[in-house]
């Protein structure tokens, strides 16, 4: 059962993303968001400190859905499949990446890449530098892909990353 506050957060985040498709992020007001979401103005303040926090919430939800849907755990036996699954998820949600890029907020995605890999490093009690390397590389490939018009397929992106990682980074 979904709590009302969870539903309100989702409605607020969806409203902000919808507004970003039509209006510059800096020009969107809290009133615009609550009007679009059909919620009272106070609801936004109960749930978020600012618009950046709304974006972070939205991205957290997308990341959580990827983690749940991927069902492929990162390990040395299926790393390539995991990366391909990640790029498929990113391609499926590329409109969000494009919106964040246009609003100069794509850096928030770096935090999500870190969350995926750094949590794994902590759980496994291993050196985090390896996971920061993976996270940074994946983020920068995604950033470059968004910046250049999303021309490659998820499989091409995964192959580029895996080829570089296997031939250069894992030695």
Where are these regions (language model features)?
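Short hydrophobic/aromatic patch on the recognition helix
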Residues: 38-48
